């Protein structure tokens, strides 16, 4: 059984709380193992899906770190529940610094696993940090402006969200008050995901008490302006994508894969987007594939 250590380390804007999952052999400092950072999807806390993948990788022989990004869950930082790609990339750098000094970790380079939107942050980090020797993206949400237009009501919808973000930013700077909308709600058209999604609303899945289901409106601009597809030509680390035609924006994954500069592999399977977060079949498929990828490339 994997060993789980509760850990804390410096992130981009305060102390971050994490869990380091180690295989039985990895708990022995004389037998270090390869390390993998796990980045969960947007707005998530570690207990929703990052812990699951970290534990599965530890079962397969890796030291795997999941953690709450700045302003989320048990980690420090304000504003709370504020989605910032730049800050999350800095947090990944801090997590890599922590793993690099841990006695259970072999100094053979770092693997990074990104789930859903975590794939964007993992890719951006890998593009700028030579410590990343291998990258795996599971059910990756990889967008650019074209994909945002297609998913957020066209150019007018995108600009409306950015205008709301600017107003919310002004309010925060003037008063310190953060304007929030639900992350998930089928009854609120302003929700970040205006649908009733079982994974996020079911307490037996991802609708857990550690996750407050709120999205800082001022985060929209950075989210919508992020171009994940443009990262692909900058990536030289071997990259694996695991996706499904029934999951989110497979066209983004295809375009990203086609633009990759380094060695790559694309595995297609079946399942909806949220199945990859907690359903045994999809998680096992993805965990097996990513473990095999990291074993070959780290």
Predicted regions and their residues:
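Alpha/beta-hydrolase fold nucleophile elbow
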Residues: 104-116
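Alpha/beta-hydrolase-fold enzymes
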Residues: 123-203
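N-terminal cap/lid segment of alpha/beta-hydrolase-fold proteins
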Residues: 1-31
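Alpha/beta-hydrolase active-site loop
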Residues: 82-103
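The serine-hydrolase catalytic nucleophile loop
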Residues: 42-55, 69
């Amino acid at each position: 059984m994997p060993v789980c250590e509760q850990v804390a380390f410096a992130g981009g804007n305060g102390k971050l709380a994490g869990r380091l999952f180690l295989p039985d052999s990895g708990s022995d400092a004389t037998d270090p193992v390869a390390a993998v950072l796990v980045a969960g999807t947007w707005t998530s806390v570690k207990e929703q899906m990052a812990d699951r993948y970290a534990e599965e990788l530890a079962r397969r022989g890796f030291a795997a770190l999941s953690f709450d990004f700045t302003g989320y869950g048990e980690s420090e930082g304000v504003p709370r529940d504020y989605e910032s790609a730049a800050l999350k990339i800095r947090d990944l750098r801090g997590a890599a610094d922590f793993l690099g000094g841990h006695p259970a970790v072999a100094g053979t380079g770092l693997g990074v696993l990104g789930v859903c939107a975590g794939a964007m942050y993992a890719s951006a980090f890998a593009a700028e940090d030579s410590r990343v020797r291998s990258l795996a993206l599971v059910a990756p949400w990889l967008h650019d402006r074209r994909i945002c237009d297609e998913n957020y009501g066209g150019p007018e919808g995108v600009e409306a969200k950015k205008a709301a973000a600017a107003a919310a930013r002004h309010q925060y700077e003037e008063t310190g008050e953060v304007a929030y909308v639900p992350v998930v709600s089928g009854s609120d058209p302003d929700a970040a995901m205006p649908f009733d999604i079982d994974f996020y609303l079911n307490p037996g899945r991802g609708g857990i008490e550690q996750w407050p289901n709120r999205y800082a409106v001022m985060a929209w601009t950075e989210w919508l302006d992020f171009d994940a597809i443009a990262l692909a030509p900058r990536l030289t680390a071997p990259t694996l994508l695991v996706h499904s035609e029934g999951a989110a924006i497979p066209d983004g994954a295809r375009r990203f894969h086609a633009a990759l500069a380094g060695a790559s592999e694309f595995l297609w399977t079946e399942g909806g987007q949220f199945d990859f977060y907690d359903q045994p079949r999809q998680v096992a498929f993805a965990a097996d594939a990513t473990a095999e990828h990291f074993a070959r490339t780290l």
